[in-house]
């Protein structure tokens, strides 16, 4: 079975009170539409067709990709009209219709729905609700067959008592779709062409309307305002927390933990409160992450410890290494096995060898640090000359005294030492001491200034 997917994403979202198109509002660091596209791709369709309207340029700019076909709906005349705009591009046997503001839909749910489709049967995703206000109602005949969907505003009191709601998500045999869309009318309370009207047409044409339901009603929850958006965010985060805990992660408080990307975890990982994981993060076995940390696009090898209030981005932390508290590792930072980065240390494009130590109050940028080298407090690499970046290279077993300025490009070779307070501008040979500071003078008879009285 070949598959085309149509994603409706043309709505304005006035209740968001935002210049940003509704479908671009984020859930867990990705736009709502981005989540839907991600799910659609996992179904391996022949084509993904995104119907856009309000804020079309912004949607294209943020989400443009070779596998997406953007279709313009100039006037928002209803869901049926929106799907009709994509008709000329549809070539597959089956068409699945999704919504750009329903980001939590699970691929497993969509797969079950697609299994219900054949040339004489379409699949409709419905949901059981305690309060179906606002949802179209699923109308069944005396044999429990779906015969129509009635929108809430058009429903009678008896129909409003129905608790089975329409999610809007359906999969249909493509051979019938053009005919059904061509027969739609806008003779309703909204004056729109409802996609839901094709259900009654299908039933009247003798097709079976087979229904599926999500395991979790929040899968089909959309967001029309900021409150609903926050509810989707919290539900997504709790879902991710449950997934990670099932994989062997201890979360001190699942309600105070956020995932905003893709996280791969090992076993016996401990994550404290207020930790944010962004982008692609790999966390191997026995890692400990302290409170209030942000980790983005990074890999933490087995046994890594990240202490409180650290920010790690684009970094690789080797087995048994540690960072923090209050450490900042910027993109390109690599810690070798058992390397140590302490409090108020910032690394950028710096490679620390196995067992290297940078204890505190240090900046290392564009630097190669050898194994077992120790960097004293207050050391900085002066790597930028105002136009270009330059590299600092320290060999193995180097000892850098406190309050050093290492003016790049400079090499300090194996076993060398630099004296505290030095400004190193020349290479230091192996096993030698580099001293680059003014000689101290003690002035005999010097008197400390006395404060002048204002009287």
Curated annotation (Swiss-Prot):
Residues 248-455 are annotated as: N-acetyltransferase. It catalyses: alpha-D-glucosamine 1-phosphate + acetyl-CoA = N-acetyl-alpha-D-glucosamine 1-phosphate + CoA + H(+); N-acetyl-alpha-D-glucosamine 1-phosphate + UTP + H(+) = UDP-N-acetyl-alpha-D-glucosamine + diphosphate. GO terms for biological process: cell morphogenesis; cell wall organization; lipid A biosynthetic process; peptidoglycan biosynthetic process; regulation of cell shape; UDP-N-acetylglucosamine biosynthetic process. Mg(2+) binds at residues 101, 224. It is found in: Cytoplasm. Keywords: Acyltransferase, Cell shape, Cell wall biogenesis/degradation, Cytoplasm, Magnesium, Metal-binding, Multifunctional enzyme, Nucleotidyltransferase, Peptidoglycan synthesis, Repeat, Transferase. Acetyl-CoA binds at residues 377, 383-384, 402, 420, 437. Its cofactor is Mg(2+). Its EC number is 2.7.7.23, 2.3.1.157. Pathway: Nucleotide-sugar biosynthesis; UDP-N-acetyl-alpha-D-glucosamine biosynthesis; N-acetyl-alpha-D-glucosamine 1-phosphate from alpha-D-glucosamine 6-phosphate (route II): step 2/2; Nucleotide-sugar biosynthesis; UDP-N-acetyl-alpha-D-glucosamine biosynthesis; UDP-N-acetyl-alpha-D-glucosamine from N-acetyl-alpha-D-glucosamine 1-phosphate: step 1/1; Bacterial outer membrane biogenesis; LPS lipid A biosynthesis. Residues 227-247 are annotated as: Linker. The keyword Repeat applies. The active site is at 360 (proton acceptor). UDP-N-acetyl-alpha-D-glucosamine binds at residues 8-11, 22, 73, 78-79, 99-101, 136, 151, 166, 224, 330, 348, 363, 374. GO terms for molecular function: glucosamine-1-phosphate N-acetyltransferase activity; magnesium ion binding; UDP-N-acetylglucosamine diphosphorylase activity. Pfam families: Hexapep, NTP_transf_3. Residues 1-226 are annotated as: Pyrophosphorylase. Homotrimer. NCBIfam families: glmU, PRK14353.1. Catalyzes the last two sequential reactions in the de novo biosynthetic pathway for UDP-N-acetylglucosamine (UDP-GlcNAc). The C-terminal domain catalyzes the transfer of acetyl group from acetyl coenzyme A to glucosamine-1-phosphate (GlcN-1-P) to produce N-acetylglucosamine-1-phosphate (GlcNAc-1-P), which is converted into UDP-GlcNAc by the transfer of uridine 5-monophosphate (from uridine 5-triphosphate), a reaction catalyzed by the N-terminal domain. PANTHER family: BIFUNCTIONAL PROTEIN GLMU, NUCLEOTIDYL TRANSFERASE. This is Bifunctional protein GlmU. It comes from Pseudomonas syringae pv. syringae (strain B728a). The lineage of its organism: Bacteria, Pseudomonadati, Pseudomonadota, Gammaproteobacteria, Pseudomonadales. The gene is glmU.
């Amino acid at each position: 079975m070949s598959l085309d997917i149509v994603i409706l994403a043309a709505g304005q979202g006035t209740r968001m009170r935002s210049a940003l198109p509704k479908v671009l509002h984020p859930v867990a660091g990705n736009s709502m539409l981005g989540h839907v596209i991600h799910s659609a791709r996992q179904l391996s369709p022949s084509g993904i067709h995104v119907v856009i309207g309000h804020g079309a340029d912004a949607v294209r700019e943020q989400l443009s990709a070779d596998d997406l076909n953007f279709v313009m709906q100039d006037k928002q005349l209803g869901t049926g009209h929106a799907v009709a705009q994509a008709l000329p591009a549809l070539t597959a046997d089956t068409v699945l219709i999704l919504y750009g503001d329903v980001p939590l839909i699970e691929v497993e749910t969509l797969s079950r729905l697609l299994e219900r489709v054949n040339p004489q049967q379409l699949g409709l995703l419905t949901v059981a609700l305690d309060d179906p206000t606002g949802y179209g109602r699923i109308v069944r005949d005396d044999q429990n067959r779906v015969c129509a969907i009635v929108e809430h505003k058009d429903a009678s009191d008896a129909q409003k008592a129905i608790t089975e709601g329409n999610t809007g998500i359906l999969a249909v045999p493509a051979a019938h779709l053009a005919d059904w869309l061509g027969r739609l009318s806008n003779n309703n309370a909204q004056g729109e062409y409802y996609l839901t009207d094709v259900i009654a047409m299908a039933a009247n044409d003798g097709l079976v309307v087979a229904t599926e339901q999500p395991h979790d009603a929040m899968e089909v929850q959309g967001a029309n305002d900021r409150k609903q958006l926050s509810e989707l965010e919290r539900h997504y985060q709790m879902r991710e927390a449950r997934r990670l805990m099932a994989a062997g992660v201890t979360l001190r408080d699942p309600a105070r933990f956020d995932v905003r990307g893709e996280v791969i975890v090992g076993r016996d990982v401990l994550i404290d409160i207020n930790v944010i994981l962004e982008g692609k993060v790999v966390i191997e076995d026995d890692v400990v992450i302290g409170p209030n940390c942000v980790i983005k696009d990074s890999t933490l090898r087995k046994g890594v410890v990240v202490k409180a209030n650290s920010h790690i981005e684009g970094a690789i932390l080797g087995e048994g290494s540690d960072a923090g508290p209050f450490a900042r590792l910027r993109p390109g930072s690599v810690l070798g096995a058992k390397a140590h980065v302490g409090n108020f240390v910032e690394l950028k494009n710096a490679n620390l060898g196995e067992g290297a130590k940078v204890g505190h109050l240090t900046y290392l940028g564009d630097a190669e640090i050898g194994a077992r080298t120790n960097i004293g407090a207050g050391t900085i690499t002066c790597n930028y000359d105002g136009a270009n970046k330059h590299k600092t290279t320290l060999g193995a077993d180097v000892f850098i005294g406190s309050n050093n300025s290492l003016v790049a490009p400079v090499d300090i070779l194996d076993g060398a030492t630099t004296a505290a307070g030095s400004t190193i501008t020349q290479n230091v040979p192996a096993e030698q001491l580099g001293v680059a500071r003014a000689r101290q003078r003690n002035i005999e008879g010097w008197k400390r200034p006395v404060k002048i009285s204002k009287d």
